[in-house]
Curated annotation (Swiss-Prot):
Bias (Basic residues) ranges: 245-255
Residue intervals of every C4-type zinc finger in the record: 343-366
Function: Putative GTPase-activating protein.
Superkingdom as given in the UniProt entry: Eukaryota
Name assigned to this protein: Arf-GAP with GTPase, ANK repeat and PH domain-containing protein 11
Entries under InterPro entries matching the protein: Ankyrin_rpt, Ankyrin_rpt-contain_sf, Arf-GAP_GTPase_ANK_PH, ARFGAP/RecO, ArfGAP_dom, ArfGAP_dom_sf, PH-like_dom_sf, PH_domain
Amino acid sequence: MTIISVTLEIHHHITERDADRSLTILDEQLYSFAFSTVHITKKRNGGGSLNNYSSSIPLTPSTSQEDLYFSVPPTANTPTPICKQSMGWSNLFTSEKGSDPDKGRKALESHADTIGSGRAIPIKQGMLLKRSGKWLKTWKKKYVTLCSNGVLTYYSSLGDYMKNIHKKEIDLRTSTIKVPGKWPSLATSACAPISSSKSNGLSKDMEALHMSANSDIGLGDSICFSPSISSTTSPKLNLPPSPHANKKKHLKKKSTNNLKDDGLSSTAEEEEEKFMIVSVTGQTCHFKATTYEERDAWVQAIQSQILASLQSCESSKSKSQLTSQSEAMALQSIQNMRGNSHCVDCETQNPKWASLNLGVLMCIECSGIHRSLGTRLSRVRSLELDDWPVELRKVMSSIGNDLANSIWEGSSQGQTKPSIESTREEKERWIRSKYEHKLFLAPLPCTELSLGQHLLRATADEDLRTAILLLAHGSREEVNETCGEGDGCTALHLACRKGNVVLAQLLIWYGVDVMARDAHGNTALTYARQASSQECINVLLQYGCPDECV
């Protein structure tokens, strides 16, 4: 039966209602007949190549009769081959009725790994909701990629990613990740008692440390820590439930597969699906996944990349790239200070990371734990990767590990300090006890003065050790206490009057008000100019002190 007879027979029996279905049948028969004819021709000629069959249907008739018979056998005997070819071509490649309208978009997303030639291949990518930084706080879809170079990039759409435009990047080397309503990633609310040969004797102290409220929040009798990240393997996510998880449990709903454009959901669901990336500058980016599982996968991948990038990155500055020989000597002098040849918390040799407000050096593993404490307690910076302005170099050169430990471990009560062989969990227990809970902090000196007045005297006397001890014990209100007798000066005024940039910088980190004025209406900047201390001037301007001379 020829193609013409097949066509006439089918069109003779079809109705207008079944036109679409019959045309599909016609397409299938045309394709089957064409393929069988080509196969016969190949066998008759003793073989031949059939690769790229779709290109064998020409848009115009061929000049060779033999080629015409091979290429378009279904229409070789028809008086109007071009029309028939056009019909067959359009029907074969026309999408069927009821096809998925998102098919094209899904195909693009499924091949996203092949998009963006020449760029770093993402180790994780997908659509997330990101909260805008504007006052409306709306959630918008972003296409997010995580690359092995330690950079998280987000785009307005998949199309922008393909074109590599309208992107914003987050450097994970100077960032940390947080999940609202969760304990720190290395902590869990309940676990078996710790009985290790390497125990540092903190179990009892940790049980007694500020745990009187545990019975009120349902945590049980104690809190202990469980391992989640080792120094030799990539970190694994271990996010224990929030202390209020039981109260929210009945509010949780099953996750859906579609992103919610309006971001409206129950409070508990929002809490569970969100995570935040906080940079060292304090900038926070809020993201939200579609499901809890997707959120956990992103958090684990980002945490792994933070650790991996810190471990694998090399110094971006060599000795020849230092701005001056004096800067190189200053950094070397920091490393040569007493106690700075070993990590302040675990005694690992040759530490390359620093905590600015503590004035200490530490190893890379302890720096990760310090970073999780937040910038309020520890401002982590790399000796090799970051820039070191003169005021920061002076802070580090004035304190050092020995002086800091005489304060923060002043009453350690014979506890065994972690060593290089200690597990990460033992190091974290020690660090949190030392800086967060202040278990080992040296006691305040006996004096009739209040802490705030004592701090003012120590600043006026430029007694750095006493000032650090008082700042560690003090509150923001005590740090901002003013001199009596109507003077109105804060400790920052006194530090700038002396031109002491180390005390000025420490006071700012511990919460002193840089906008405060004394009884004469002068800010600390006025006293810094009177003392001709350009370093104090730079620090004050950096933190927003009003410059009335401009």
